[in-house]
């Protein structure tokens, strides 16, 4: 019985791990280009970059690949409140200190999102809804 349960766990976990390995790892420039080409659809991938800035927002957090989050070259990571408990447990309450200046690797879907009240201005973002999407910080 235990062996059967163990095999069942392996069968469930193995496809998820291999699917992660099959995803490309994109730089911010590659992510922005692919999101623009696929818009309005999103692109699932791994993303890796050095965090240049971070800010709290409405119970969540934003991480940016550029110091100026308005930059067209910026890849933003929108961390939703649902991910905050797991992230603060793992990295502490001061996420800004935990991430800024460090290289992060995460899994998710990148897309162009309309920002501002007038529309016509877009940002490229990856949404993090659970802490497990952030795979490494170094």
List the predicted regions and their residue ranges.
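Positively charged n-region of N-terminal signal peptides that target proteins for export
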Residues: 1-5
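OB-fold single-stranded nucleic acid-binding module
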Residues: 20-138
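N-terminal signal peptide c-region/cleavage motif recognized by signal peptidases
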Residues: 13-16
